[in-house]
Curated annotation (Swiss-Prot):
Gene behind this protein: ssuD
GO molecular function, one term: alkanesulfonate monooxygenase activity
Keyword check for Translocase: no
Lineage of source species: Bacteria, Pseudomonadati, Pseudomonadota, Gammaproteobacteria, Enterobacterales
Top-level division of the source organism's lineage: Bacteria
Protein name listed in UniProt: Alkanesulfonate monooxygenase
Listed NCBIfam families: alk_sulf_monoox, PRK00719.1
Signal sequence range: none
Similarity remark: Belongs to the SsuD family.
Gene Ontology BP term (one): alkanesulfonate catabolic process
Note: FMNH(2) which is absolutely required for this enzymatic reaction, is provided by SsuE.
Native species: Escherichia coli O6:K15:H31 (strain 536 / UPEC)
Length: 381
């Protein structure tokens, strides 16, 4: 099975070390463009662009990278409760059209009550998933070309429609990650690819089996992906030394503050990440070559595969054997590590190299009539 390898655009900052200004660098448009172009040339399938108040806007960043890349896909967040599904469907179709079919979408429900309140969202965990399920139903139906009337608990639309369809049919693939039962049910019923954070293989296997069974109950099959950091070097010793350097400027106070912030979230996945290290610096190798040091101060994906190319490739293939076909990777700093992964890891894997999409045929189109429909040719009387 060929593997889809993704990279990451660090719109919330980048550098050589975690938890310090030491070794940091400016993350401006030019730098993000360098990373995107490196990923494009090295054969990555796409890039994940993060979302939230600590990040630049993912949609604008993705749109700005379209002209400077050829085949790279952009995995961009959909935010139920923050954005209406009709607006999100128009945005998604437009991004897909402008990129010639290079748009992918990642459903993000949110987990930090403090940040959500700042965005005007005051739903609890279960209510957010109710709203996300309704959002996704409307979003998918619009992209399928339906005129949608929907009267849900959280979302109400009447006569909603999309005039400009996406390039990818029936719609651009929808990714989603969540560890709670209600999250897995949403994934099983509505999304195309279920993402998990980088837990030890036995825990990942358990989640995959749960989601696969839930999807089968809906008569569906679903793909799987995993989000991991990677520290790959020419030797295993060099890789572990690089891992230790990454957290060499962290002090206990910074770790404690970060863990306190993570504790206020209601994300089951974040709780599972925190349990891998319990906020302590010792025993961070939680599974062979799987290191939890990143999660001491970074929310979300908090583990890294560490080793030389053949070793990391062997660990990736262990996850692939569980049914995972997509790997969303990152490393610090992201420009240099994109090259290291491409040069030291890719030769030891069966990597799916994306093709440059072919230009779409030009279809003449008149101006929309009455903000309601696109004029079509009619017989002359």
């Amino acid at each position: 099975m060929s593997l889809n390898m993704f990279w990451f655009l660090p719109t919330h900052g980048d550098g050589h070390y975690l938890g310090t200004e030491e070794g940091s660098r400016p993350v401006d448009h030019g730098y993000l463009q360098q990373i995107a172009q490196a990923a494009d040339r090295l054969g990555y399938t796409g890039v994940l662009i993060p979302t939230g108040r600590s990040c630049e806007d993912a949609w604008l960043v993705a749109a700005s990278m379209i002209p400077v890349t050829q085949r790279l896909k952009f995995l961009v967040a959909l935010r139920p409760s923050v954005t209406s599904p009709t607006v999100a469907a128009r945005q998604a179709a437009t991004l897909d059209r402008l990129s010639n079919g290079r748009a992918l979408f990642n459903l993000v429900t949110g987990s930090d009550p403090q940040e959500l309140a700042g965005d005007g969202v005051f739903l609890d965990h279960s209510e957010r998933y109710e709203a996300s399920a309704e959002f996704t139903q409307v979003w998918r139906r619009l992209l399928l070309g339906e005129t949608v009337n929907f009267n849900g608990k959280h979302i109400h639309v009447r006569g909603a429609k999309l005039l400009f369809p996406p390039i990818q049919q029936p719609y651009p693939p929808l990714y989603f990650g969540g560890s709670s039962d209600v999250a897995q049910e949403l994934a099983a019923e509505q999304v195309d690819l279920y993402l998990t954070w980088g837990e030890p293989p036995e825990l990942v296997k358990e989640k995959i089996e749960q989601v696969r069974a839930k999807a089968a109950a809906h008569g569906r099959k679903i793909r799987f992906g995993i989000r991991l950091h990677v520290i790959v070097r020419e030797t295993n010793d060099e890789a572990w030394q690089a891992a230790e350097r990454l957290i060499s400027h962290l002090d206990d106070e910074t770790i404690a503050k970060a863990q306190a912030a993570f504790a206020r979230t209601d994300s089951v996945g974040q709780q599972r990440m925190a349990a891998l290290h319990n906020g302590k610096r010792d025993n961070l190798e939680i599974s062979p070559n799987l290191w939890a040091g990143v999660g001491l101060v970074r929310g979300g994906a908090g583990t890294a595969l560490v080793g030389d190319g053949p070793t990391v490739a062997a660990r990736i293939n262990e996850y692939a054997a569980l049914g995972i076909d997509s790997f969303v990777l990152s490393g610090y700093p992201h420009l240099e590590e994109a090259y290291r992964v491409g040069e030291l890891l890719f030769p030891h894997l069966d990597v799916a190299i994306p093709e440059i999409p072919q230009p779409q045929p030009l279809n003449p189109q008149g101006e929309a009539v009455a903000n309601d429909f696109i004029p079509r040719n009619v017989a002359q009387s």
